Amino acid sequence: MVLQARSKHRDAAPRPPRPARSSPPPLNGASEVAARELGPERAPPSPGRRSTASRKGPRAETAAPAPDGLAGRLAAGLHWALGLRRGRGRTWSTLLLASFAALLHWSHITQLFENDRHFSHLSTLEREMAFRTEMGLYYSYFKTIVEAPSFLSGVWMIMNDRLTEYPLVINTLKRFNLYPEVILASWYRIYTKIMDLIGIQTKICWTVTRGEGLSPIESCEGLGDPACFYVAVIFMLNGLMMALFFIYGTYLSGSRLGGLVTVLCFFFNHGECTRVMWTPPLRESFSYPFLVLQMLLVTHILRTTQLYRGSLIALCISNVFFMLPWQFAQFVLLTQIASLFAVYVVGYIDTYKLQKIIYTHMISLVLCFVLMFGNSMLLTSYYASSLVIIWGMLAMKPQFLKMNVSELSLWVIQGCCWLFGTVTLKSLTSRIFGIADDAHIGNLLTSKFFSYKDFDTLLYTCAAEFDFMEKETPLRYTKTLLLPVVLAIVAAIGRKIINDMRGVIANQETDVRKHQVDHGELVYHALQLFAYTALGILIMRLKLFLTPHMCVMASLICSRQLFGWLFGKVHPGAVVFAVLAAMSIQGSANLQTQWNIVGEFSNLPQEELIEWIRHSTKPDAVFAGAMPTMASVKLSALRPVVNHPHYEDAGLRARTKIVYSMYSRKAPEDVKKELIKLKVNYYILEESWCIRRSKPGCSMPEIWDVEDPDNAGKTPLCNILVKDSKPHFTTVFQNSVYKVLEVIRQ
């Protein structure tokens, strides 16, 4: 059948290598091809197309033999990785441009953050309060390690934590993806010790007068201040990310103009690409730069004909660095594995290469499982199940070859096997290990397609960032021309795929099809774009994957593979700069809007609350309340709390439901009884939570009506307690926002 012919093409015996130059040995079993690998502009010509040498203009320069030794091999590899062929000068100029992009982005996000909060002039308490919700929770563990007597004692404290989910003792390093805080705390301690040793001042402090009858505060600036150090490292990392984007665009398109397009598209759509300048401590701020590196490595592996062990090791390390800081990383990698499997099924990569990629992902998953102290969510994830299913399907390839079906039917069969197998294995492993921590993700996705509602799902969907993508978002993409450019590129890739598939289904002659199914990296990027689009449409927060990937895809406007027919008539530079000039009209306006954001952080009601807790309650007093407020109480007042904003644990979700019953219509004695079981001493009540409504059906009493229909129609408990907290609670503190209720024990 057709499949057997295609299989012969994929797994045919390799040609003997030419002794053109020395290079590192490929992995055992890898196909050996000509020693000079073909880059994006040096692919063999298709039948009926003139070769590169036959074009008008200067002849392409041949690559010089790589010098002997490790340094020579590294230099040659760097030239190749950047898609360059004209010597070291072009390589270093490319790296210089990448460094400039990194510096520019670092300066941009640093200035935006300072403009928004006036962070350099805030007191320590104000800086901590500026890290709201889960940001404050994550920063609290950095603070714990920094202030501990020693680094190891600080790590032991966060691994045996009683403040976060009192009275439970939990390993927060296992639960909350805190390796970034551990690493940054170690760097901070090393930095301050070295600076103290050599006598260099690391921070400058002064008194800031706030006016309006407020007491003066002490404000410190410099890397010796923990909060400043923490934020500075995050911004440096995300500055380096822009260098990766430049290299990524350059490599994918085969032109430094492609790198320029990627970087400028990112800046022109900056508000849609990242939120690191507003929310530095979020997990994505640490994790996403390593996804950019990881996808660059995947692109390199797909493009090259020889598969080197070093590339796979680098991919494994980048996988680990991407997964360790962020619990959501596994879902992103699931979309990548699905895209790669689709690329394999239709014939753009061979079995051997996909097997090595799958093994690399498996190894990185196991490493993360070990480093996360056996976090079972990793092994029971859809990502892990997908890896196992694809591994099994690759092992069963001979059985698929024996199926007497058409090529198209076989593609559908393999896709259905992967989908059904992944879902089934995920369900089985979750039941076997008794894991329900990620059940809310399935419920959230179900609610997007059906009318399913429950308490946890509504807490997510009532937040704007977890709602569907805004209707204005595609319009904003269109105004900067990002969407039209990407659509043109996707159309060009789609045309290539259709032509390739026609050849495969028609069972064309083998060596002709060999050229047609090259460049699987382009197909992978198109499929990955579709996956990110689906995620971004379903959950607005996830457009932070979609928009940067669109910027990377935009670099392909410089690709001769896709637009060689156009560049034969018009100079590529003219096309690119014309497009960038049109993009800059709205893009510069977007940047100006960001630069015009000027403010200063202030939250006097919460400052009063924290100061009262510090001075009027015992150190072991236990608090409950809204998740964002609890993060601040733990961080700044150092008091035990029973709930917090990290919602990815089934037990914590059950605790939060009990705590939030204060905003239900239940009887006060029932709520009090449950709070006493959690050993709560004080409850921080916020009247705004009782009346706040982001959209119909999204006030807390309305959410509780779905969960507790028996009490629907009654007066919400929070409304009753705002007026009079007796006899079950005693009001011990109150200001314009917060009301602290002491739980009366009888």
Curated annotation (Swiss-Prot):
GO terms for cellular component: endoplasmic reticulum membrane. The chain crosses the membrane at residues 93-113, 139-159, 227-247, 248-268, 308-328, 329-349, 357-377, 378-398, 405-425, 481-501, 520-540, 562-582. It is a multi-pass membrane protein. It is found in: Endoplasmic reticulum membrane. One of its GO terms (biological process) is protein C-linked glycosylation. InterPro entries: Dpy-19/Dpy-19-like, Dpy19L1. Keywords: Endoplasmic reticulum, Glycosyltransferase, Membrane, Phosphoprotein, Transferase, Transmembrane, Transmembrane helix. The keyword Glycosyltransferase applies. Its main location: endoplasmic reticulum. It holds the Pfam family Dpy19. Residues 14-27 have a biased composition (Pro residues). It catalyses: L-tryptophyl-[protein] + a di-trans,poly-cis-dolichyl beta-D-mannosyl phosphate = C-alpha-D-mannosyl-L-tryptophyl-[protein] + a di-trans,poly-cis-dolichyl phosphate + H(+). GO terms for molecular function: mannosyltransferase activity. Residues 1-68 are annotated as: Disordered. PANTHER family: C-MANNOSYLTRANSFERASE DPY19L1-RELATED, DPY-19-LIKE 1, LIKE (H. SAPIENS). Belongs to the dpy-19 family. This is Protein C-mannosyl-transferase DPY19L1. It comes from Rattus norvegicus.
